Amino acid sequence: MKSKKVILDTSAILTYFEGEEGKETVEKLMIRSTSEKIELFIPFSAAIEFYYINFNLQGEETANQRFAMLMSLPVEVLKNIDEPYMIQAGRLKASYPISFADALIAAYVYLENASLVHKDPEYLTLEKEINLITLPLKKKLV
């Protein structure tokens, strides 16, 4: 039986590390990935975003420590950026109000027929294109 594919967005990774609402969902997915019920992935662009966000907010040492922790989790980093992924990312970026990094991540989700775990409102515009597992969105302070 083929495993279900699940991709973590940067926001889901940060939710896990920061202990934000929705962390339990990410933890459960990690547990399921160790029993081979699902395949859990992180796109390279999400790993890069995770690193530089930690670097900017907490410094290089913490960024390095957290990145090492990320790489030790039961997830596989998606490094493929072949032509189909480039074209799909370009199509999504041209068609929807999303960032370049989100277009790359969404292209993986689309082409791998995966589900995306996130808490980024930008992805909600893609709900007809990709499968979404939306974590509780952060409330905006007025």
Language-model-detected regions and their locations in the chain:
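Active-site neighborhoods of divalent-metal-dependent phosphate/nucleic-acid chemistry enzymes
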Residues: 76-119
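Structured helix-beta-strand junction loops
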Residues: 35-37, 73, 112, 129
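Acidic, PIN/NYN-like endoribonuclease modules and their adjacent C-terminal/linker elements
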Residues: 1-5, 78, 106, 111-142
